[in-house]
């Protein structure tokens, strides 16, 4: 069966680099599935869960923005930030969520700060969701 080379990188490090069967990414128009021999494309990513399947194993990562380039045999993700599910610090993500919720409750926060706070809350919730899914599954 044909495979795709998936590379996920940030400015600081390479997060994931493997041959995979399927990539599911959070594009700005919604979730997109990419199989080998997909038509070339380039798109922006929104904060969300990025999944990669290798056989019956599924790997989850959290990406916070960036770009995704698809070639027929390769997917390259240049992410603003990215972390594998097993790297997520649940206590830190829970604290970030609480801080964002407290800021959201502040009705005097100007519009731009409110948008940043919503984005922070969304990232924290995604990180917690991905970490929780990993805890419920057997180790990969």
UniProtKB/Swiss-Prot annotation:
It comes from the Bacteria. It is a peripheral membrane protein. One of its GO terms (cellular component) is proton-transporting ATP synthase complex. Keywords: ATP synthesis, Cell membrane, CF(1), Hydrogen ion transport, Ion transport, Membrane, Transport. Its main location: membrane. Gene3D superfamilies: ATP synthase delta/epsilon subunit, C-terminal domain, F0F1 ATP synthase delta/epsilon subunit, N-terminal. SUPFAM superfamilies: Epsilon subunit of F1F0-ATP synthase C-terminal domain, Epsilon subunit of F1F0-ATP synthase N-terminal domain. CDD domains: F1-ATPase_delta. It holds the Pfam family ATP-synt_DE_N. It is found in: Cell membrane. NCBIfam families: ATP_synt_epsi (TIGR01216), PRK13446.1 (NF009980). Produces ATP from ADP in the presence of a proton gradient across the membrane. HAMAP family: ATP_synth_epsil_bac. F-type ATPases have 2 components, CF(1) - the catalytic core - and CF(0) - the membrane proton channel. CF(1) has five subunits: alpha(3), beta(3), gamma(1), delta(1), epsilon(1). CF(0) has three main subunits: a, b and c. Belongs to the ATPase epsilon chain family. This is ATP synthase epsilon chain. The gene is atpC.
């Amino acid at each position: 069966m044909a495979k795709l080379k998936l590379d996920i990188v940030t400015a600081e490090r390479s997060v994931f680099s493997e041959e995979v069967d399927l990539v599911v990414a959070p594009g700005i128009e919604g979730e997109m599935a990419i199989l080998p021999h997909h038509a070339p494309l380039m798109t922006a990513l929104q904060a969300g869960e990025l999944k990669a399947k290798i056989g019956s194993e599924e790997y989850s990562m959290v990406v916070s923005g960036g770009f995704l380039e698809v070639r027929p045999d390769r997917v390259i993700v240049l992410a603003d930030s990215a972390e594998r599910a097993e790297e997520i610090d649940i206590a830190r993500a829970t604290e970030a969520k609480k801080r964002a919720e407290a800021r959201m409750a502040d009705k005097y926060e100007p519009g731009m700060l409110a948008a940043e706070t919503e984005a922070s809350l969304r990232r924290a919730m995604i990180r917690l969701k991905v970490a929780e899914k990993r805890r419920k599954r057997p180790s990969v």
